[in-house]
UniProtKB/Swiss-Prot annotation:
It comes from the Eukaryota. Keywords: Chloroplast, Chromophore, DNA-binding, FAD, Flavoprotein, Mitochondrion, Plastid, Transit peptide. One of its GO terms (molecular function) is FAD binding. May have a photoreceptor function. Binds ss- and ds-DNA in a sequence non-specific manner, lacks photolyase activity. Its main location: plastid. Pfam families: DNA_photolyase, FAD_binding_7. This is Cryptochrome DASH, chloroplastic/mitochondrial. NCBIfam families: crypto_DASH. It is found in: Plastid, Chloroplast; Mitochondrion. GO terms for cellular component: chloroplast; mitochondrion. InterPro entries: Cry_DASH, Crypto/Photolyase_FAD-like_sf, Crypto/Photolyase_N_sf, Cryptochr/Photolyase_FAD-bd, Cryptochrome/DNA_photolyase_1, DNA_photolyase_1_CS_C, DNA_photolyase_N, Rossmann-like_a/b/a_fold. Belongs to the DNA photolyase class-1 family. Binds 1 FAD per subunit.
């Protein structure tokens, strides 16, 4: 009889609690003392390559956060008597190297099911490479994919998984109504206890190694240096939170937001804020890297509801987590269309390239204070409120008419909570490319409603510190005498094109190309053909949100 090695290939599931792969490894290890468990994480160079539009996809802030997540997982695994092997390179090569090759040996690779093409293509490459290596020595290698990133398990959702979720609604409300009425959230899977994963085998070397920023395959040495700097000292004092990666910090944040501060009980009223740590949960970065599962968050909310209070706020965090699920399943259904210029609806619109506008948007110098403040916050801290994201996305895509994928790329580079399905799904929707109505935000009115005194704007746009609230949405409209007195030095609003939204139609028949994907080419979830109809075009209208 040969040996059995179980490789836990951690990706966006950097936790021990409620992790189906970890639980499965513990079960396999309990079946025989000959089973050895090797937990591994790879900083895969694929994610660090520039996007199709030339922007480095993995930024310094996310580099720091991910290093912290991986370090925290390593510490937790060591506390159990196991460890985490950390590598940089290609997952395919690293995991193939871990494959046993002796006669009758078997290697079982456990990994979380992913929904987008780059990740699923990576699975296939790992599977192929490990099989080939095992076969060379008359051994065997298999991969098990375990679902784990959503609140509702894919096997429980009331949609046709076998047809690639072809009956999944393309808008949120019917999706939510169906999942809430038809399925239950499964129980949280307990974390393993000491020694359940056994000790890592002595034959595998390199467990003592943890990469530094300069070891990560960043697109440039400047990004690596910036990452190093962020680790060593410089938390911007205006950051909403000192985000530190890792499961222990994620669980501490859940505990704080629910039990220690009771902020959960007022979430509905505060969620549109932009300043401070507590207007929203700030769980997104940890959820994106899988340091905490949405199921754990919801089970804690349910406990809070039974022990403290149940109200609209406690429900609303669950509501938001269902949005997160929606975008995961939406990505699975539509495959690479979420990366295409004409989106999942196949809508044609006149997008343009304008380097001046794009640069102003990225650097927070558009002359629109709410946009500039949010964009500066993102670049400095890796975070932006949901209110801010809606506004800056609407401005870039719908007001400026810039190819919205440049915006999605920029977010991918900067956001600590970057999640492929949430980011590209939200951008595609914000650009009006998922079908249905188009929600264009009135930036001046949004400023008045959500930052009437300009407190948030002044935090990030220092040159507006002296501008009275009455002129905060458009400082250059202040009387000349006032502008001179305060020495206002802020750009005029960029001139933007007038856009005709009725032109956004969907072409009849299947997409004929020209949209140009943002990432890889695979189609993991399949897709439905575009049905460009007059009714659909007629349903497109410009809602200016107040
Ligand atoms: C253009 C654009 C891009 C976005 N990109 C991302 C992204 O890459 N990663 C990401 O996690 N969120 C993304 N969002 C969604 C949302 O803005 C963030 O999840 C939220 O602001 C994070 O703050 P929070 O954790 O305090 O959220 P809370 O308000 O506390 O909400 C709780 C959780 O619900 C989930 N959630 C809330 N709103 C959404 C939403 N619209 N879509 C998906 N999940 C949601 C998040 O996991 C969040 O942590 C994007 C939104 C827009 C408009």
């Amino acid at each position: 009889m040969g040996r059995t090695r179980v490789v836990i290939w951690f990706r966006n599931d950097l936790r021990l609690l409620d992790n189906a792969c970890v639980a499965r490894a513990a079960t396999l290890a309990s079946e025989s003392s000959d089973v050895e468990v090797v937990p591994v994480y790879v900083f895969d160079e694929t994610y660090f390559k520039p996007s199709k539009r030339g922007l480095a996809r993995f930024g310094a802030g996310r580099g720091k956060f991910t290093l912290e997540c991986v370090g925290d997982l390593k510490t937790s695994l060591r506390a159990l008597g196991s460890d985490l092997l950390v590598r940089c390179g290609k997952s395919r090569d690293v995991i193939a190297e871990l494959t046993l090759t002796g006669a009758n040996d078997r290697t079982i690779i456990l990994t979380q099911t992913e929904v987008t093409s780059e990740e699923t293509e990576m699975d296939v490459a790992v599977e192929r490479a490990t099989r080939e290596r095992a076969r060379g020595g008359a051994a065997s290698a298999t991969m098990e994919r375990h679902w784990g990133s959503t609140l509702y398990h894919i096997d429980d959702v009331p949609f046709d998984v076998t047809s690639g979720l072809s009956d999944l609604p393309d808008v949120f409300t019917p999706f939510r109504n169906k999942v809430e009425s038809k399925c239950k959230v499964r129980d949280v899977i307990p974390a393993p206890t000491a020694n359940e994963l056994g000790h890592v085998p002595a034959s595998v070397e390199g467990f003592e190694w943890m990469p530094k920023p300069s070891d990560l395959p960043f697109a440039s040495s400047e990004i690596a240096m910036d990452c190093d700097k962020r680790i060593k000292d410089c938390l911007d004092e205006r950051s909403v939170l000192d985000f530190k990666g890792g499961e222990s910090n994620a669980l501490a944040r859940v505990k704080y937001y629910l039990w220690e501060s009771d902020r959960l009980a007022t979430y509905f009223e505060t969620r549109n804020g932009m300043l401070g740590g507590d207007y929203s949960t700030k769980l997104a970065p940890w959820l994106a890297l899988g340091c905490v599962s949405p199921r754990h968050v919801v089970s804690e909310i349910r406990r809070y509801e039974s022990e403290r209070v149940e109200n609209k706020s406690t429900y609303w965090v669950i509501f938001e987590l269902i949005w997160r699920d929606f975008f995961k399943f939406f990505a699975l259904k539509h495959g690479n269309k979420i990366f295409h210029l004409d989106g999942t609806a196949g809508r044609r619109a006149s997008w343009k390239r304008d380097e001046k506008i794009l640069k102003a948007w990225k650097t927070g110098t558009t002359g629109y204070p709410l946009i500039d403040a949010n964009m500066r916050e993102l670049a400095a801290t890796g975070f932006m409120s949901n209110r801010g994201r809606q506004n800056v996305a609407s401005w870039l895509a719908l007001d400026a008419g810039i190819d919205w994928r440049h915006g999605a790329d920029w977010f991918e580079h900067h956001l600590l909570d970057y999640d492929t399905a949430s980011n590209w799904g939200n951008w595609c929707a914000a650009a009006g490319m998922t079908g249905g109505r188009i929600n264009r935000f009135n930036i001046a009115k949004q400023t008045k409603d959500y930052d009437p005194a300009g407190e948030y704007i002044k935090t990030w746009v220092k040159e507006l510190a002296e501008v009275p609230a009455a002129y905060i949405a458009d400082p250059n409209q202040a009387p000349r005498e006032l502008r001179d007195r305060i020495g206002l030095n802020y750009p005029n609003k960029l001139a933007l094109p007038r856009r005709d939204f009725t032109e956004m139609g969907s072409p009849p028949g299947p997409r004929r190309g020209g949209g140009g994907g943002g990432r890889g080419r695979g189609r993991p979830g399949g897709s439905t053909p575009n049905r460009g109809t007059k009714a659909r075009v007629a349903s497109v209208y410009d809602t200016v949100y107040g």
